Amino acid sequence: MTKHLTLLLIMNSVFTQDHWETAVFANDEWRYLVPSSEPDTNWNEEYFDDSDWAQGPGGFGYGDGDDGTIIDQTLSVYFRTTFNVEEITKLTRAIISADYDDGFIAYLNGNEVARSYNLPEPSTFVPFDFATYYDHEASLYDGGLPESIVIDSLSLDSMLIDGPNVFAVQLHNVSI
């Protein structure tokens, strides 16, 4: 079976008092790194210089027809994108909708906010050459739904700032 590395829909929607706003769309431009060694420890933080990283539209994969950016097969890929927040005090929650193959860790401004079940427990360091414990297939391409991860306002208040913020994702495969 061919494995596909996908971030078809990592979408961070923020809920204000009277409406939803999408902060990161699935096909937004991302900076990404296919590592051959461990990236800098601050790669997922807002002030990290990612200008040497490659850039491409979201929907990363191996070229199965639904990818915005095609990459070579690898055990891991690191992604970053920025979004703006105005009036952080009005946010009540955020939702990350994730469709992925095989595992991921998501960060807001360097703070871990979500992790797939097939990686070591939350807040545990996962090296670039780590393979997930087992397979997880993306589901949107087959008519399924993405996973939803809710982040409450107390967590958002401690992670986000008014102005530019960074949403970063570390993606791992079960094998190459």
Q: What are the functions of these language-model segments?
A:
Residues 4-16:
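Sec-dependent N-terminal signal peptides
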